[in-house]
């Protein structure tokens, strides 16, 4: 039960961050900038956090649940991404929808990779020091 409460706390924080950042970044261009940027940031943070904390044994299981599953998990939003893509398609904005889908996938995977590599690099630097 404790772990559930920890995830809920992280989820509360992450969902609020997503809402306020999404509001701040809302755009009239038709491209869902807020969701795109939020998912990209989340991919990088989760890739970095999980790798860095595992390699350096920094986070307890509870902190990993709070930050990874709760905060970052609720901060990113695949369901919103999916609905926004469908709305773009229904509005016959096929090019924008395609850019959004492929951009989100490649940027997300790319930033997750950069986060993992950065965490591994930081670990090597600490081993040298």
Swiss-Prot record:
Does this UniProt record's set of keywords contain Membrane?
yes
For the ligand (Na(+)), the binding residues are: 73, 76
Top-rank taxon of the source lineage equals Bacteria
Membrane topology per the entry is: Multi-pass membrane protein
Catalysed reaction equations from the record: fluoride(in) = fluoride(out)
GO MF, any single term:
metal ion binding
Compartments it resides in: Cell membrane
Membrane-crossing residue ranges in chain numbering: 4-24, 30-50, 63-83, 95-115
Any inhibitors or activators noted?
A: Na(+) is not transported, but it plays an essential structural role and its presence is essential for fluoride channel function.
An example Gene Ontology CC term for this record: plasma membrane
Task: Please give one Pfam family short name.
Answer: CRCB
Under the heading InterPro entries, the entry gives: FluC
Keyword list (alphabetical) reads:
Cell membrane, Ion channel, Ion transport, Membrane, Metal-binding, Sodium, Transmembrane, Transmembrane helix, Transport
| Example GO biological process | cellular detoxification of fluoride
Q: Which NCBIfam families match?
A: crcB
Annotated family: Belongs to the fluoride channel Fluc/FEX (TC 1.A.43) family.
Q: Which HAMAP family match?
A: FluC (MF_00454)
Task performed by this protein: Fluoride-specific ion channel. Important for reducing fluoride concentration in the cell, thus reducing its toxicity.
Please give the name of this protein.
Answer: Fluoride-specific ion channel FluC
Gene it is expressed from: fluC
């Amino acid at each position: 039960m404790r772990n559930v409460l920890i995830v809920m706390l992280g989820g509360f924080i992450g969902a609020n961050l997503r809402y306020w950042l999404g509001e701040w970044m809302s755009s009239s261009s038709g491209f869902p900038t807020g969701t795109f940027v939020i998912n990209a940031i989340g991919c990088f943070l989760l890739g970095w956090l999980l790798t860095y904390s595992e390699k350096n044994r920094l986070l307890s299981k509870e902190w990993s649940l709070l930050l990874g599953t709760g905060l970052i998990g609720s901060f990113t939003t695949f369901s919103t991404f999916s609905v926004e893509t469908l709305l773009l398609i229904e509005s016959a904005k096929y090019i924008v929808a395609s850019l959004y889908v492929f951009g989100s996938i490649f940027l997300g995977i790319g930033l997750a990779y950069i986060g993992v590599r950065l965490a591994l690099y930081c670990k090597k630097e600490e081993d040298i020091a």
